[in-house]
């Protein structure tokens, strides 16, 4: 009975949030996804050059913020330059599986906030992050932090609105995602979506998804 009441309470709390809080990928406030930003816009950012922007685009997609961080470090950017750049571009981190080091790459996240991120795992929805982290920061800081994270979307049940929060997923690819429902395994997703995009892009999209019930 207690579990049922807790589940009902959670449902009510999540339902009580504005629709934007339901999105499973944090809404951009100051950043653009590093895998989808144009080369021209990238070249204008602090610490970037046209040559570095071109090289970064050629190396995409990056499947984690760690991979992007290694690229930028290898390109000779200082930690200060990289941190400043992460105020403008980033690769979302999975709230449920990101390593401590990945989370600490989010600008302004120190050991104290890291503990709060980890304390509430596993996150059933981004609304849980919104509710729990709201205890520690104001609304502006909450929105800033939320833009760096995501909770995987269920490939079989996610709404159109939620799926469209995946960076770079437009209405055409949304139709392809839905056409092959229900998916009986991730291999089918890879096979079917691989008809339309490269295997690297399939892997980039896949990181935002789950088939777990």
Go through the PLM ranges and name each one.
Residues 52-97, 113-156, 173-212:
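Accessory alpha-helical DNA-binding modules that contact the DNA backbone or grooves
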Residues 32-37, 93-103, 153-163:
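Disulfide-bonded cysteine-rich modules in secreted/extracellular proteins
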Residues 5-16:
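Bacterial N-terminal signal peptides
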Residues 18-25:
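Boundary at the C-terminal end of the N-terminal hydrophobic targeting segment
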Residues 42-46, 103-107, 163-167:
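Short amphipathic alpha-helical boundary/capping segments
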Residues 30-63:
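N-terminal targeting signals for Sec/Tat export/insertion, comprising classic cleavable signal peptides
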Residues 49-50, 110, 170:
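Small-residue hinge/turn detector
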